[in-house]
Amino acid sequence: MARRRVAPCRPRSDESPERAADPAAARAAAVALLARRDLPSGELRERLDSRGFAPQATAEALSALASEGALNDERYAHNYVAYQAGRGKGPVRITADLRARGLPQELIEAALAAGVDWRAQAAAARVRRFGRSSPATLREKARQARFLQYRGFSADHIRAATGADPDTD
């Protein structure tokens, strides 16, 4: 019978409660999680809490990692925006994703304002999906607008990408 492997940083139910209250153990678990991928502080706190670490130990571990520069929500937000914009996602969808990950609105707005031309991104997403030709019919224009809206672009970005004029449509 195969034994179930338990991650070394996860406190087991039969372990002592001192380990769950130990900031060093919480820090080791946080470093192990951050080694896999960058996480915002809110999501890292949730993961440490779900692994049974005491809130005080979690707070101490997160503050130590933040002071060392290993945990930086601003860096995470900028990297996330750049990555998702490169995948053709718009600012509305990216904002919703970052809010769900627990980032403050000020960081989200700063990351979205940092050098991405959202109109050009919307146009590029439209061209990748539908080709270079402009939508010929109102039905095709609406189809492309729905696609861009699903991707998270605002109405202004969609109008610019589809060449729609609100006065003539």
What are these regions (language model features)?
Residues M1-D169:
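An alpha-helical, amphipathic repeat domain used for nucleic-acid recognition
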